[in-house]
Amino acid sequence: SIDDNDFWECYESRKVVLQQMGNPSSELTSYCKVVFSKGVNTICYLTDNTQKEQETIFAFLDKYGLKLARNKLMDILSKVYPALYQYLLPYRFGNALLDQYFQDYKYQKVINKILPEFVSQVEDQAEKREYNYILAPRTSVIESLNRKDAQLYFMDAMGVEYLGYILSVCRDLNLIASIKVCVSELPSITSRNKEFLELFADARY
């Protein structure tokens, strides 16, 4: 039972055994159907070992996500689906509006819901566009970088929502990461908006 003191210890042992057995697919489909009988506790009986279970976790979040407090959901995901937990970790922009916006955005994306208060915030920002003066322009940020012996890796269409995940993975790998978030000119498509490449003319990329 989820209320047993040794539940998570048994959970980890079972997860290891399943990995050693090769996560038998013959039983996985029926298990994922039956486990939904656990209701709001379903997620505690799933692992991230296989794509099927990961998809079942998202099906659970769609159905029961709003029934769990965010901090409780985060605690469970840290054990059940660490990568998803890392995705939901906050990235601190140093601005309350951006911090809250992206945390709410990621949470709603994961539970597959759009909450009314978030819609109101989006509509409000569509008019105010406060992010335009909260964040520095990309050109000025890049010009301030030390580009000597730099290597440039360009990742197109990677959302800022992944910064919390990236920093968490860097910590796991004992890597040092320094991130500067900026705003680009519209349209942001690469073919029309890549003036920054000129600043890295001598860099490797």
Question: PLM features: what roles do these ranges have?
Answer:
Residues 1-150, 157-205:
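…; additionally, a secondary subgroup of soluble metalloenzymes is captured
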